[in-house]
């Protein structure tokens, strides 16, 4: 397998990380995961733009253009002959003697690799269980940073409880999942938290909002309370690798009929169609 290290394609065994890389020591960096369908990077420009935004928000000046990044990632996918899978890319602030503050002029370190993705067909078709948990993350969740410790801990609690995802609540209001955006269908309207600093504005989320409008479904980007969530007709979550997955039980309680609902199914079908169109056009 080839990996990308600072613009160069090398064998994975040749790649190394300096012990004083600030990403390794502080989680001082940003990342993206981009899905590959039929050899095509889905939503590449949107992911690349968000990558640059995240870098700018934490003061990292990337030494390449969006076009350079897209070209390198496409080469990586081609070199590894990836048909169905994903690319993980991250940039750290660079290497420096360990201290919290940093000097200007550090050289950012960018790495990327490909991996296979198993489409969660069972989960998409039949739905999953989720739990709720308190959202104790920092208040810049709009930045896709490497700092994911609370997400990891909460996802593990969900896993140990036999659930697929943990839905996070801040002051009694739904923000998002540990690795997904969250939507509730209430009185036929799709409700989801607005894209502010409390959530990551997912690329899949943006696609879904476009599909909601295109399909004439009502949308309301306003926070959902815990009580509203548990009484919703439908709940679904979205992410790059999960796509759209129904939540049919929450904290052991059935949601709606306990099966994937009609709005979720409609959006799943529309999303799959958009994937096919993107893969055939490219």
UniProtKB/Swiss-Prot annotation:
<dbReference type="InterPro" id="IPR005784">
    <property type="entry name" value="D_amino_transT"/>
</dbReference>
<dbReference type="InterPro" id="IPR043131">
    <property type="entry name" value="BCAT-like_N"/>
</dbReference>
<feature type="binding site">
    <location>
        <position position="100"/>
    </location>
    <ligand>
        <name>substrate</name>
    </ligand>
</feature>
<keyword id="KW-0032">Aminotransferase</keyword>
<dbReference type="GO" id="GO:0019752">
    <property type="term" value="P:carboxylic acid metabolic process"/>
</dbReference>
<protein>
    <recommendedName>
        <fullName>D-alanine aminotransferase</fullName>
        <ecNumber>2.6.1.21</ecNumber>
    </recommendedName>
</protein>
<feature type="binding site">
    <location>
        <position position="31"/>
    </location>
    <ligand>
        <name>substrate</name>
    </ligand>
</feature>
<comment type="function">
    <text>Acts on the D-isomers of alanine, leucine, aspartate, glutamate, aminobutyrate, norvaline and asparagine. The enzyme transfers an amino group from a substrate D-amino acid to the pyridoxal phosphate cofactor to form pyridoxamine and an alpha-keto acid in the first half-reaction. The second half-reaction is the reverse of the first, transferring the amino group from the pyridoxamine to a second alpha-keto acid to form the product D-amino acid via a ping-pong mechanism. This is an important process in the formation of D-alanine and D-glutamate, which are essential bacterial cell wall components.</text>
</comment>
<dbReference type="GO" id="GO:0046437">
    <property type="term" value="P:D-amino acid biosynthetic process"/>
</dbReference>
<dbReference type="InterPro" id="IPR036038">
    <property type="entry name" value="Aminotransferase-like"/>
</dbReference>
<keyword id="KW-0808">Transferase</keyword>
<feature type="binding site">
    <location>
        <position position="50"/>
    </location>
    <ligand>
        <name>pyridoxal 5'-phosphate</name>
    </ligand>
</feature>
<dbReference type="GO" id="GO:0047810">
    <property type="term" value="F:D-alanine-2-oxoglutarate aminotransferase activity"/>
</dbReference>
<keyword id="KW-0663">Pyridoxal phosphate</keyword>
<dbReference type="GO" id="GO:0030170">
    <property type="term" value="F:pyridoxal phosphate binding"/>
</dbReference>
<feature type="binding site">
    <location>
        <position position="176"/>
    </location>
    <ligand>
        <name>pyridoxal 5'-phosphate</name>
    </ligand>
</feature>
<dbReference type="GO" id="GO:0005829">
    <property type="term" value="C:cytosol"/>
</dbReference>
<dbReference type="InterPro" id="IPR018300">
    <property type="entry name" value="Aminotrans_IV_CS"/>
</dbReference>
<dbReference type="Pfam" id="PF01063">
    <property type="entry name" value="Aminotran_4"/>
</dbReference>
<feature type="binding site">
    <location>
        <position position="98"/>
    </location>
    <ligand>
        <name>substrate</name>
    </ligand>
</feature>
<comment type="similarity">
    <text>Belongs to the class-IV pyridoxal-phosphate-dependent aminotransferase family.</text>
</comment>
<dbReference type="GO" id="GO:0019478">
    <property type="term" value="P:D-amino acid catabolic process"/>
</dbReference>
<dbReference type="InterPro" id="IPR050571">
    <property type="entry name" value="Class-IV_PLP-Dep_Aminotrnsfr"/>
</dbReference>
<feature type="active site" description="Proton acceptor">
    <location>
        <position position="144"/>
    </location>
</feature>
<dbReference type="InterPro" id="IPR043132">
    <property type="entry name" value="BCAT-like_C"/>
</dbReference>
<comment type="subunit">
    <text>Homodimer.</text>
</comment>
<dbReference type="InterPro" id="IPR001544">
    <property type="entry name" value="Aminotrans_IV"/>
</dbReference>
<feature type="modified residue" description="N6-(pyridoxal phosphate)lysine">
    <location>
        <position position="144"/>
    </location>
</feature>
